[in-house]
Amino acid sequence: EDDQAFKLDIELCKKMGFNFVRKHQKLEDPRDLFWADRLGILVWDEMPSGRIFSSELIESTSKQWIELVMRDAGHPCVVGWVPFNESWGIWHVGQRPQQRAFADSIYHLTKALDPSRPVIGNDGWEYSLGDLWTLHVYYDDKKTLSEKLKDIYSNPQTSVTEAGKPRPAALPGSNPSQLPILLTECGGIGFLSPGNTIDAFAYGPIPKTEHELEIAILEVISQIERSNLLRGFVWTQLTDVQQEINGLLYFDRKPKRALEEIKKIMTRPNIEAL
């Protein structure tokens, strides 16, 4: 219960060149938002996802979401609201009108509560309503990141993910092409500490050395630079978490590469200009 842990994470983000964090699948502790306000880093608030769409999910999500927006709207660090992530809890939003109606209603509810901030209706894919078009695009052994982004922009019905069920970038009837496009999950490059044999999860091949890790990170950033479509990106992720070994830091917050080296990559001139 030490406030310094919240402060440290924000300081580490800033030392690596980041100006924004996307809080993922958690109702953030207000102490974290206090330090974000004080130290100067932008935040998106995100609602944890339900599992099975039902009347109970509609009721509980709506209630908790209203409470979250009203609780955090006074924080100047909060610059966006994310009620849904990757269609979790609304798994059939593209096929079942009831689920799409719920997702759209939460967008309108949020705008009624706080018209001053952008609302990201369904972060990652299957856009229906929202103030930004946000995409989650990871490693693909067939196409580069910039090629995939070009395909998606040309045809929003293109699936964002190659794993499991196809998930189009946008749903029929929506029109996101005039909105700012952000890559709100990318990278995801894994790296294990020497001697670690955990059953690990990461996106794409796992580098074997720190130098290979740096080259892999640089390649993703270079692809972002090559795309002229993006207005920002979110790197996956700050730290390792259990089997997820794709943090820029180990779980104990030890950097996998020197913080200043990561900052050089993340703040290249063309990235700063997004």
Regions from the language model: what does each represent?
Residues E1-I90, Q95-D104, I120, G173-S174, ...:
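Active-site-adjacent substrate/metal-binding segments within catalytic domains
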Residues K14, C77-W81, H108, L129, ...:
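Substrate-binding clefts and catalytic carboxylate motifs of secreted carbohydrate-active enzymes
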Residues Q25-E28, G124-W125, Y139:
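Short beta->alpha connector loops
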Residues L33-F34, E126-D131:
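Short loop/helix-cap segments at secondary-structure boundaries that form the rim of catalytic
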Residues P48, E86, G124, V137-Y138, ...:
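Residues that form or immediately flank small-molecule/cofactor binding pockets and catalytic motifs
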Residues F102, W133-L135:
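Polar, glycine-rich mid-to-C-terminal structural blocks
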Residues A103-L113:
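Extended active-site neighborhood of metal-dependent phosphoesterases/phosphodiesterases
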Residues L113-V119:
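Short beta-strand/loop segments at the ligand-binding rim of alpha/beta enzyme cores
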